[in-house]
From Swiss-Prot:
PANTHER family per UniProt: MEDIATOR OF RNA POLYMERASE II TRANSCRIPTION SUBUNIT 31
The protein, known as: Putative mediator of RNA polymerase II transcription subunit 31
Homology family: Belongs to the Mediator complex subunit 31 family.
Main localisation: nucleus
Stretches the record annotates as Disordered: 1-38
Species, as recorded: Dictyostelium discoideum (Social amoeba)
Subunit field text: Component of the Mediator complex.
GO BP term (any one): regulation of transcription by RNA polymerase II
Low complexity composition-biased segments: 7-30
Keywords: Activator, Nucleus, Transcription, Transcription regulation
Length: 176
């Protein structure tokens, strides 16, 4: 390799990185990495930042699981909703409805279910498989039809607006 490259082969046949971090490959015992630089950039500046990120990810995953009626049925049948601490946790998770957090949610119906889980009656109904099946069916129909209908409704509204604009342009201004 040329000497202008940051990676060079030394006299022993090992590959060296001329930057601050030295990476050495040994043929005998695999790869070994020798770090000479203490200024390596870590993804987190401190343990608290890493803990906050992990909490964010875990809460996001849990919130999104709430969009699954079968998972809600599992929680109900395993008596999670009878635990006051768990119910309080669901109340705490309401902050995910704020726009700065909601933008990370892929399944927005999870926020709707989070609202419903604040109701004792809804939590009780989730114990019954018929209720869970009904919720699942309604969710499926919403995905199947509402999205498509919503797009056709938007297209119709757009066409009406365009027609109104064209009519306004064609009509000459009236003078008194």
């Amino acid at each position: 390799m040329s000497s202008s490259s940051p990676i060079n082969e030394n006299d022993n046949g090992n590959i060296e990185n001329n930057n601050e971090t030295n990476i050495t490959e040994n043929g005998d015992n695999g790869e070994s990495i020798d770090k000479k630089d203490d200024n390596i950039v870590l993804p987190y500046e401190n343990d608290e930042e890493e803990a906050n990120y992990l909490r964010f990810i875990m809460e996001l995953e849990f919130i999104q699981c709430l969009s699954n009626p079968r998972y809600l049925n599992y929680l109900a049948q395993n008596r999670y909703f009878q635990d006051k601490a768990f119910v309080n946790y669901l109340v705490y998770l309401q902050y995910w409805k704020k726009p700065e957090y909601a933008k990370f949610i892929v399944y927005p119906q999870s926020l709707y279910f989070l609202d419903l889980l604040q109701e004792e009656r809804f939590r009780q109904e989730l114990n019954h498989s018929q209720s869970t099946d009904f919720i699942h069916e309604q969710q499926f129909y919403h995905w199947q039809y509402y999205r498509n209908n919503r797009m056709s409704i938007k297209e119709q509204e757009l066409q009406q607006q365009q027609q109104q604009q064209q009519q306004q342009q064609v009509q000459p201004p009236t003078t008194v």
